[in-house]
A protein has these predicted regions:
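C-terminal PAP-associated
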Residues: 1-171
């Protein structure tokens, strides 16, 4: 869960007893400190109308994707942030657990300097460690669209930099 205003990701563990649900528990296991971000004041324009789109900021998008690599576990997460001037970008995280609890292994904000808003992402990692981020794009000159970008497993790890260029899926 994104904790807007405190630059934290709150981690919860849920243990469900399907036979006796009163034995089920929800436990807050950690708060992970992120790089500073703001999710306020995002205005997503679209051509031909003054009607703006909701940035859905302040919450993680979709569900966190989980992968077990035997020697460590990974969860991928993302949410929308204000990258300046009310423009939206996608903040993404690779969370890792090597056996001593979850930590932020790498994080980054995808927001090329082209005036476009990027928000409402969905992020995942494959069995090779490649990361793909799909997201919505819009501006006063670009109709709402879908694009992807990513990070190859060959990229310098832990830096939060995408080395797979943005590609349009639907314009």
């Amino acid at each position: 869960i994104v904790d807007v205003g405190s630059n934290k990701l709150k981690m919860w563990e849920i243990d469900i007893d399907w036979v006796n649900t009163s034995n089920s528990t929800i436990t807050r296991i950690s708060d992970l400190t992120t790089e500073p971000f703001s999710s306020q004041g995002i205005n997503i324009a679209q051509p031909g109308t003054g009607q703006q789109l909701d940035a859905l900021s302040g919450m993680t998008m979709v569900r966190l994707q989980y992968r077990n690599f035997d020697s460590y576990e990974v969860m991928m997460a993302n949410h929308t942030v204000n990258v300046g001037g009310g423009r939206a970008g996608v903040r993404w995280y690779e969370l890792r657990n090597t056996g001593s609890g979850w930590s932020i292994y790498q994080q980054g904000t995808y927001a090329p300097e082209d005036g476009e808003n990027r928000w409402m992402g969905s992020i995942s990692m494959n069995q090779n460690g490649d990361i793909a981020l799909g997201y919505s794009v819009s501006s006063s000159s670009t109709y709402p669209s879908i694009r992807i970008a990513g990070q190859s497993s060959d990229a310098p790890l832990g830096l939060g930099i995408f080395d797979i260029d943005e590609t349009s899926i639907l314009e």
